[in-house]
Amino acid sequence: GLGDVYKRQLQSCGPNVDLSMLDKYEKTLFNCTLENRNLLGEAKLELNKKYLDHDRIGFLLNQHHSILRDHLNISTPKIEAMIDSANEAGAVGCKINGSGGGGCMFAYAPGNASSVADAIESVGGKAFLINADVGTKIVTS
């Protein structure tokens, strides 16, 4: 089960790690940190592929948001309304971002951004469309 996974991950940290001193909340934080690390590793592998699996990226975003919402209590009713609306409109993944209390989230909606933006605005959000690019590069003539 999940407890066995965490135990193996903890053992991989080294022989001197002992979680017995942690209280329930601290253990939750520790486990969430490990789970988030694993999701990040999976996302990195996916993002480095020649052909991106948008559904997989969306799934990983949703998983990360679930950890933040369900285990760390980092979300708000407004964020949840925007995420629900975005998902219903066709987003493949959504998550809160920033500090969590400011009402900021993003939706991953390749090929469907306008409909998802409209859905976010329909529940009181302010939507901005952004596009990812390769980033800064050196151009030589």
Regions found by a protein language model. Give the residues of each.
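Glycine-rich active-site/cofactor-binding loop and its immediate structural neighborhood
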Residues: 102-104
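C-terminal nucleotide
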Residues: 3-93, 106-141
